[in-house]
Amino acid sequence: MIQQESRLKVADNTGAKEILCIRVLGGSSRRYAGIGDVIVATVKDAIPGGNVKRGDVVKAVVVRTVKERRRADGSYIKFDENAAVIIKNDNDPRGTRIFGPVGRELREKKFMKIVSLAPEVL
């Protein structure tokens, strides 16, 4: 469960290391974001020479959450960290690599490029 002021690890090679959620997209009173939801965030920590720099406002899709999520078959999925992938306005990733596993919910929400780049889909 990601909300405003939540900090997330960045799971791609755009150069950002950590982002801070400033808005959950999808309605004026929407409070939480889960796996597959889009957020607006600001870059809090970045490596020199990367595609994004500290202070940039970016859109990102959540790929891992610590809070467990119930699936339709009754199983639950949760991860060790909160992580996101920075995306462009057309929902394609800005980076060329994805690090770590991503949730199957991304396939259902039509983030196919992220699913194809990910090393593992859980």
UniProtKB/Swiss-Prot annotation:
InterPro entries: Ribosomal_uL14, Ribosomal_uL14_bac-type, Ribosomal_uL14_CS, Ribosomal_uL14_sf. Gene3D superfamilies: Ribosomal protein L14. Binds to 23S rRNA. Forms part of two intersubunit bridges in the 70S ribosome. Part of the 50S ribosomal subunit. Forms a cluster with proteins L3 and L19. In the 70S ribosome, L14 and L19 interact and together make contacts with the 16S rRNA in bridges B5 and B8. This is Large ribosomal subunit protein uL14. One of its GO terms (molecular function) is large ribosomal subunit rRNA binding. Keywords: Ribonucleoprotein, Ribosomal protein, RNA-binding, rRNA-binding. The keyword Membrane does not apply. GO terms for biological process: translation. Pfam families: Ribosomal_L14 (PF00238). CDD domains: Ribosomal_uL14 (cd00337). GO terms for cellular component: cytosolic large ribosomal subunit. It comes from Mycolicibacterium smegmatis (strain ATCC 700084 / mc(2)155) (Mycobacterium smegmatis). Belongs to the universal ribosomal protein uL14 family. The keyword Cell wall biogenesis/degradation does not apply. It comes from the Bacteria. Signal peptide: none annotated.
